[in-house]
Amino acid sequence: MTTTPKSEQDRVIIFDTTLRDGEQCPGATMTFEEKLNVAAMLDEMGVDVIEAGYPFASDGDFEAVHEIAKRSKNSVICGLSRAAHKDIDRCAEAIKPAERGRIHTFLSTSPVHMKYKLQMEAAQVYEMVISSVTRARNHTDDVEWSAEDATRTEFDFLCRCIEAAIKAGATTINLPDTVGYAVPEEYREMFRKVRETVPNADKARFSVHCHDDLGMAVANSIAGVQGGARQIECTINGIGERAGNAALEEVVMAMRVRQDKVPYWNRIESKMLTHASKTVSAATSFPVQYNKAIVGRNAFAHESGIHQDGMIKNAQTYEIMTPETVGVKGTSLVMGKHSGRAGLIHKMEELGYKLSRNQIEDVFVRFKALADRKKDVYDEDIEALVDEQLLHGQDLIRLKSLTVIAGTHGPQRATMKIDVDGQLRIEEAEGNGPVDAVFNCIKALVPHDAKLELYQVHAVTEGTDAQAEVSVRLSHEGRSMTARAADPDTLVASAKAYLGALNKIVAKRQRDVRQDAPAVAVAG
């Protein structure tokens, strides 16, 4: 359990309708096996009621609800049904194997629904409420009745229908904001007034079911609980009709994090929330938006330098819950163009590097340049930058600029500027391909007789903007020297790697002859 219950009166039942309302979202259809997997996960994570489907809709829905009812270990298994007796009977048959089963029947009560959808008078609707709930109660003691479009229903008629449903045997009364029309204060007051007005309101548990058409499904759900409801109907990732439903992960964590304002508890194991999100996303092929609350990729990610600095000092500066609480391994300091020195230093320390102040400054300058060119900077990118600094930070020969002209006609041409121990040199050369042109340019700038033994390229990370890491091995006077370099531009990385190997030859010869290397090794 995620919280210690204060009293049964403060307990909120979590009613998950991912497999019913969630699957009604266009494109979110799940296979039989996927439904079973999702249901097993919901059962394991502590969902009180699983609305497994609408058995009358199809044989496939019936079979899924029936099989889930067989397999459930902890949750109440619920089936949805219209007010028609044949629907209710089919639903009862589907949930029959469940140790604890529920029939959820509904009927529209708003003027617009009664007139245009049902084409019935209020008196007819009232009688059908009694008839349908009575029929359902003949099959099971656990019956939920929903007043579809409750938030647009005339208050007096709504109260009459609720009273009749409870008298007929309904144990849960659901008042949905079917079209996401309500605002929190209005929804809270509706529950408060209904519970005050309906004489037998204390004989049933009240439930919220909110849609997100105005982006207030979660806020309205919490408001309904504050107004006296003790069941929240919701879905994993908030999937559902049109703009979706209240997201289970959000209502659960709102109750956990804001106990001061929302002092209620539930049975959900919050450490499974991220896993649940990924499971449903995979089953429905609906990606979770990056900035989705609680379970989005960026929910515990920080790129801003100011935020990263605060997080390094104390995570509570910018996080109101720990990532581990919802099943995320830890906070992510995302390295990008908004990151500062503190974030970069922290990341380098995480990766096991300890650099001097001057080395850090050099890496930071190159990191900023890389971040401006690359959408995402990964750990591997940071490692490549640091490795290049450690390997080539004291190099005698440094690349200053490179321009390559390439195309389908004529030879490729490279123009390069380098710094040789403080002396700038510039040259251009042609080649059979852009890499050949770059290497010929280096040979013109730094005449040498080293032979190229290896040239190898691979991507440091994924994506078209990934850094290329190039390895070059040169042989000279019986010795082989290998160097590698990384850059988003493969040709720049190639030039840096070649120069890196050349620098190793220079350094080796300098040690061997014990004299000034520039005049001996890079003359010309």
From Swiss-Prot:
Recorded GO MF terms: 2-isopropylmalate synthase activity; acetyl-CoA C-acetyltransferase activity; manganese ion binding
SUPFAM superfamilies per UniProt: 2-isopropylmalate synthase LeuA, allosteric (dimerisation) domain, Aldolase
GO cellular component: cytosol
Similarity section: Belongs to the alpha-IPM synthase/homocitrate synthase family. LeuA type 1 subfamily.
InterPro entries from the UniProt entry: 2-IPM_HCS-like, 2-isopropylmalate_synth_dimer, AIPM/Hcit_synth_CS, Aldolase_TIM, LeuA/HCS_post-cat, LeuA_allosteric_dom_sf, LeuA_bact_synth, PYR_CT
GO annotation, biological process: L-leucine biosynthetic process
NCBIfam families: leuA_bact, PRK00915.1-3, PRK00915.1-4
Enzyme Commission number(s): 2.3.3.13
Entry keywords, A to Z: Amino-acid biosynthesis, Branched-chain amino acid biosynthesis, Cytoplasm, Leucine biosynthesis, Manganese, Metal-binding, Transferase
Catalytic activity: 3-methyl-2-oxobutanoate + acetyl-CoA + H2O = (2S)-2-isopropylmalate + CoA + H(+)
Region annotation Regulatory domain: where it falls in the sequence: 398-524
Protein's name in the database: 2-isopropylmalate synthase
Domain Pyruvate carboxyltransferase, residue spans: 12-274
Pathway the protein takes part in: Amino-acid biosynthesis; L-leucine biosynthesis; L-leucine from 3-methyl-2-oxobutanoate: step 1/4
Mitochondrion is among the record's keywords: no
Gene3D superfamilies: 1.10.238.260, 3.30.160.270, Aldolase class I
UniProt cofactor(s): Mn(2+)
Quaternary structure note: Homodimer.
Gene from which this protein is expressed: leuA
Residues binding Mn(2+): 21, 209, 211, 245
Superkingdom assignment: Bacteria
Location of the protein in the cell: Cytoplasm
General function of this protein: Catalyzes the condensation of the acetyl group of acetyl-CoA with 3-methyl-2-oxobutanoate (2-ketoisovalerate) to form 3-carboxy-3-hydroxy-4-methylpentanoate (2-isopropylmalate).
Primary location recorded for the protein, binned into one broad class: cytoplasm
Keyword Cytoplasm listed: yes
Species of origin: Rhodopseudomonas palustris (strain BisB5)
